């Protein structure tokens, strides 16, 4: 529960009433509040309040407000393992990942000729990422932590993160892997109290060595990674049958995200600089460079390249662009 405000506030109160037989744990972070628990009409009433609140001061490029401003976290779930087991059971009972003949045919086609587990995982992750379009369509009451089934996702070919992740889990299972959905909070940390503080759904797959590898097909389009390294050290909770504690995504070393620029320039007698740049990148650096092209229409590519040059010099002129048939064949001529 966010306990910050964008306006001066005299008093903010949050009250929750639960059955007597229920237990609830809570903690207030990054500030102080008054709290109480009273018995009212045969129920437990928890009240939390702050007074004389001023707008929380923001800073440029600051962390998410959930990581800096006052907030209340509470849960009736004892431990993260309990929530992990529940998340697993609710989807297994519903049959979210039941195999589908036409989807099985596609899986067999994709993994044909792939020899290693990582080759199979990669081709399935990228196909799901590129072919299940992200589209948030309201379906009314009932939307929540239960993932839509394979038939719906494969037929519609669209959905939000849980539909994309659910499709990948289904594909991985049809390829013989042990895979499950996982919950995460993109943009801020998840505290130790097992509260419902998630905004994103991903997947995990068990590797041959017995470890689970996180996969995020929602962020994979136009990205060479299987998990966005822009989300390093991010908390996530897998819905696995043995139950899991809160996990943390691994750190990716800087050398996995290099940028190498080779410049071949010549200064003419009249002071004009002519030449070419060759840029090589990997990981998130590669994704950032690709985003110059992937975040707009192809008809805007030339204007986009011109903006890149004008950022170097307002007198720069784009002479020519040869995008080639493949990304590695794209060449740009420039003049400064």
Question: What residue ranges belong to the model's regions?
Answer:
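Short, solvent-exposed loop/turn segments at the edges of secondary structure
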Residues: 9, 41, 102, 196-200, ...
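Solvent-exposed beta-strand/loop surfaces of large extracellular or lumenal domains
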Residues: 26-46, 182-185, 251, 291-324
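Short, conserved phosphate-binding/catalytic loop or strand-edge motifs used
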Residues: 104-105, 140-149, 185-187
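Active-site-proximal cofactor/substrate-binding loop regions of enzyme domains
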Residues: 121-123, 129, 141, 148-159, ...
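Hydrophobic/aromatic-rich core segments of domains that either
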Residues: 162-252
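Long, His/Glu/Asp-enriched segments that create or flank divalent metal/ion-associated functional microenvironments
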Residues: 246-249, 259-264
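Conserved small/polar residues in nucleotide/adenosyl-binding loops
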Residues: 329-336
């Amino acid at each position: 529960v966010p306990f910050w405000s964008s306006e001066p506030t005299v008093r903010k109160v949050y009250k929750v009433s639960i059955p007597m037989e229920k237990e609830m744990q809570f903690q207030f972070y990054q500030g102080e509040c008054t709290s109480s628990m009273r018995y009212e009409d045969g129920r437990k009433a928890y009240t939390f309040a702050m007074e004389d609140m001023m707008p929380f001061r923001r800073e440029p490029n600051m962390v998410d407000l959930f990581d800096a401003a006052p907030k209340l976290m509470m849960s009736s779930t004892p431990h993260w393992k309990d929530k992990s087991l529940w998340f697993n059971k609710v989807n297994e009972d519903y049959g979210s990942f039941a195999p589908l003949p036409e989807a099985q045919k596609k899986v067999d086609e994709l993994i044909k000729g792939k020899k290693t587990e990582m080759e199979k995982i990669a081709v399935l992750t990228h196909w799901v990422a590129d072919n299940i379009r992200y589209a948030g369509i309201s379906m009314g009451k009932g939307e929540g932590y239960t993932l839509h089934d394979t038939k719906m996702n494969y037929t519609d070919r669209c959905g939000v993160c849980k539909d994309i992740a659910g499709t990948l889990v289904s594909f991985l299972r049809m390829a013989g892997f042990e895979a499950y959905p996982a919950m995460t909070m993109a943009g801020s940390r998840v505290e130790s109290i097992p509260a419902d503080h998630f905004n994103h759904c991903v997947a995990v797959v068990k590797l041959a060595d017995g470890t689970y590898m996180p996969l995020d097909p929602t962020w994979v389009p136009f990205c060479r990674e299987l998990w966005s390294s822009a989300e390093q050290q991010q908390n996530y909770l897998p819905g696995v049958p043995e139950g899991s504690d809160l996990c943390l995504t691994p750190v990716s070393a800087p050398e996995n995200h290099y940028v190498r620029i080779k410049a071949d320039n010549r200064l003419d007698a009249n002071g004009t600089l002519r030449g070419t740049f060759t840029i090589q990148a990997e990981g998130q650096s590669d994704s950032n460079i690709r985003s110059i092209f992937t975040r707009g229409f192809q008809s805007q590519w030339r204007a986009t390249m011109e903006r890149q040059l004008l950022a170097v010099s307002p007198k720069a002129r784009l002479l020519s662009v040869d995008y080639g048939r493949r990304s590695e064949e794209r060449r740009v001529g420039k003049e400064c």
